[in-house]
């Protein structure tokens, strides 16, 4: 979380992920995952710098990376191409967040800088004021994203369920004949 006064780093804390990764490596043989940002970190001015920092994390010993949420799979595929071009060959888990309320979308995108494609914006605009319909539409959109990822060879996917196990269960039910 962002410190209340906005000052980084706090005393006794890490200023870069590599510092944490290196300390964890010293503690034992752990599998270490890290975050990555297919649309670029919200505070990063240039995408190439973002990939350079990701490469540093990988070189420090990260075993896999999980992406920040995205709503357009082409962004993920392009990101995957760009990092592979830079020699980042570890597993990449796409992060899919089922948006179940209009408020959740606004808050999540404000924090992450994630772009909302027109197709999804139309869904939120149409169903956003009906909680049950928005929840079902958000689950359907996330399911469609996952189906596309699977069809394009992605085998491991992280679902940001946001402490809503029923949402994850609904997605798994939707995929029950696809993922066996």
Predicted regions: what they are:
Residues 45-56, 138-148:
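Short, acidic/polar
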Residues 57, 61, 94, 157:
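Conserved, mostly hydrophobic/aromatic
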Residues 11-37, 81, 85-139, 144, ...:
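Active-site pocket-lining/capping segments in soluble small-molecule metabolic enzymes
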Residues 29, 62-63, 154:
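A structural motif
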Residues 1, 35-41, 70-71, 95-99, ...:
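Active-site beta-loop-alpha junctions enriched in small/polar residues
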Residues 1-24, 44-48, 69-84, 164-174:
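Active-site-adjacent beta->alpha loops and helix N-cap segments on the catalytic face
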Residues 64-70, 156-159:
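Short catalytic-loop micro-motif centered on adjacent basic/acidic residues
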């Amino acid at each position: 979380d962002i410190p209340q006064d906005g000052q980084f780093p706090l005393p006794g804390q890490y200023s870069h992920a590599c510092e944490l990764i290196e300390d964890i490596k010293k503690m034992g043989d752990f599998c270490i995952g890290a975050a990555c940002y297919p649309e670029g970190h919200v505070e990063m001015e240039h995408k190439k710098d973002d990939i350079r920092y990701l490469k540093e994390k990988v070189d420090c010993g990260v075993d896999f990376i999980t992406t920040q949420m995205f709503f357009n799979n082409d962004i993920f595929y392009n990101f995957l191409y760009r990092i592979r071009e830079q020699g980042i060959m570890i597993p990449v888990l796409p992060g899919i967040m089922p948006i179940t309320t209009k408020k959740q979308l606004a808050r999540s995108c404000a924090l992450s800088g994630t772009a909302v494609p027109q197709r999804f914006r139309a869904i939120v605009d149409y169903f956003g004021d009906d909680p049950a319909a928005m929840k079902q539409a958000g689950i359907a959109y996330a399911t469609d994203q996952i189906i596309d990822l699977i069809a394009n060879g992605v085998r491991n996917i992280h679902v940001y369920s946001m402490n809503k196990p029923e949402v994850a269960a609904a997605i798994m039910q939707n995929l029950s004949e696809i993922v066996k």
